[in-house]
């Protein structure tokens, strides 16, 4: 009716099929992050050890950056993508909502892009890592909903989601 306000359901029905499954977007982000991490690490090693390039002045020691990128940048995308896809099947639960995994994907992806920019503009470092944490935390409520779904075997899903929660801390 004219003038009547109606709630509209947010949906991605018109989006490409790529966005309709959590593992697709998260695995792409993880693979991209893996390639970017390898490129950055190769650049750093070539500069520091082979002396092929000018040594950059990073805001953190290079081994710390490498550890951060691998531990919190590369692997989590694959873990989130897998658990958001397989977890509901293990637990006979409803699938993870599109907005849950797409918001996590967007925030974590933006955070890691910001992190790479922060390597040259250190003032962006906390903002970038804050976006990564926000994305990580955006995914957790949906995963905890799946983990708390009653089923015969919850040990595995509780361990994985508990580990992801611990990783956010």
Residue ranges and their predicted role:
Residues 1-169:
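Hydrophobic alpha-helical transmembrane segments of multi-pass integral membrane proteins
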């Amino acid at each position: 009716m004219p003038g009547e306000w109606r709630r509209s359901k947010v949906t991605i029905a018109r989006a490409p099929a790529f966005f309709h499954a959590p593992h697709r977007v998260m695995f792409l982000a993880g693979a991209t992050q893996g390639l970017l991490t390898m490129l950055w690490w190769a650049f750093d090693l070539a500069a520091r050890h082979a002396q092929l390039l000018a040594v950059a002045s990073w805001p953190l020691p290079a081994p710390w950056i490498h550890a951060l990128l691998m531990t919190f940048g590369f692997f989590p995308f694959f873990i989130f993508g897998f658990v958001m896809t397989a977890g509901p099947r293990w637990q006979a639960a409803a699938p993870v909502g599109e907005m849950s995994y797409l918001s996590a994907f967007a925030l974590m992806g933006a955070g890691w892009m910001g992190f790479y920019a922060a390597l040259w503009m250190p003032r962006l470092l906390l903002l970038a890592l804050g976006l990564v944490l926000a994305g990580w935390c955006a995914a957790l409520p949906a995963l905890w909903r799946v983990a708390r779904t009653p089923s015969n075997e919850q040990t595995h899903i509780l361990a994985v989601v508990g580990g992801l929660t611990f990783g956010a801390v």
